[in-house]
Amino acid sequence: MKFSRDTIAVLKNFTSIYSGIMLKPGNTILTRSVTGASYGEAEINDTIDFEAAIYDLNGFLSILGLVTDQAEVSLAEDASNIIIKDQRSTIHWPAADPSTIVFPAKKIPFPVAKVIFDLKGSDLQQLLRVAGGLSLDTFAITNKDGKIVIHGYNQLEDKELARPLYSLVCGDYEGDAAFKFIINKLNMKMIPADYRVMLWAKDDKFATKFEGTQASYVIAMEQGSSHEFQD
């Protein structure tokens, strides 16, 4: 198989969630963080035709960047190495023991969302850039005055999240149930793009899905999140 630029871009992004990857036959790539707080999935145009674990994905991508775009990637007959081969060079990258990395066994099904809204890529970029400039470490997606709003906080200085340093209105909210979904900025590892954001909560369980055209992500919420949704 060949790795297209789009597939490489997804893999580079997934290194920010976890350092390794499990490649399986098909068109789906999955990853998750060690803590399980972040999960990513992507449907790629390339077709993976082998199964192999990569322990150091950044290193693998760096090596892949040294060969031409036409390089073929395959698995050795004894499954000990991943072979990268172009017109003139052949590179043998060691395949890892799958037990040495963490990876999702299958796609995570997301429950029916309680709240859905669209987040533009330009708004996401602004959100993250402002976070860097203001040292924001926490976001809260909530409802206020009939709107869905994302607040940004510096929780180190504002443990109760009472003083938002940044607010972004994302759309109208027609529901009656109040909610507050708290996200650790460190888990915001998405590729800059437009996303459909889905909020789900039941009892003391919370999750948010960022569904994009190139990749989708599910993020666990932080302590202090709350909701008034009814089953």
Where are these regions (language model features)?
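Long, charge-dense
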Residues: 98-117
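DNA polymerase processivity clamps
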Residues: 1-94, 113-231
